[in-house]
Amino acid sequence: VTLAGKGGEEVSASTSTFEVSFNTPIRTSLSKNYPNPFNPSTTIDYELSNAGMVSLVIYDLKGAVVKTLVQEHQEPNYHHVVWNGLNNSGQSVASGRYLLKMNAPGYTETITMTLLK
């Protein structure tokens, strides 16, 4: 860029540009499910800042797997999944508290969800 100074002399200035994207989260995170308590379904929102293998698995309080919601490679983005209160066999689960564990590259988080019938 060439500019004119006070006396009309040429003054050089450099410019730089940068791009800001609001489409990619800056951090990986798992939000609380909503509604909570829920019946018959609940929504889980999560954000990925990096691509990689992601798993969201629901466990009962004894540690047994109830439902695998996500088990796949995903791109950085804002994601959500709905759990309808069914287990991996398609059967309705009992009322009670359940643990949702999310694993993603460099990130692990567990939240508690309550199903009321």
Specify the residue positions occupied by each region the protein language model found.
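Short, compositionally biased serine/threonine- and acidic-rich segments at solvent-exposed termini, linkers
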Residues: V1-P25
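Beta-strand-rich extracellular modules
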Residues: T2-K6, L86, N103-P105
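Generic structural signal for well-ordered beta-strand positions
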Residues: V11, V66-K67, V93
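Signal that preferentially marks extracellular ectodomain short beta-strand elements
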Residues: V81-V93
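C-terminal tail/sorting-segment detector
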Residues: H73, Q91-K117
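Glycine-centered coil/turn sites that cap beta-strands in beta-rich domains
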Residues: E19-Y34, F38-D60, T68-E72, H80-W83, ...
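Short beta-strand edge segments in extracellular beta-sheet folds
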Residues: T2-A4, E19-S21, E72, T112-K117
